[in-house]
Amino acid sequence: HKGAHFIGTNPDLNIPTERGLLPGAGSLITLLEAATRVKPVYIGKPNAIIMDKAVEHLGLKRQEIVMVGDNYLTDIRAGIDNGIPSLLVTTGFTKPEEVANLPIAPTHVLSSLSEWNFDEN
């Protein structure tokens, strides 16, 4: 339909599962974008729309929050791009060997969330 809005949740091309990588929302959105020639408006991570709502809901300052995730492109960039400290856990999508080549470093990097000291951070 001409003039309809095209809203996407997130640009994740793949999602890790127990069976390996499967197509994520971004892969389907990319297909629809190519077919319709309409650019989507993403409302999920890493975009400000969802992050601003989360900060508002928490009622905290951005520096009092830590964005935790295993995917640099969505989870960690959500923190970086929105002024929120980030914690990359390398147990999922982003692997330990990729960390040194990331364009902007996360605030913290751990191999497991169990390494995080909740009393000190």
Give, region by region, the residue ranges found by the protein language model.
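Asp-based, Mg2+/Mn2+-dependent phosphohydrolase catalytic module
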Residues: 1-121
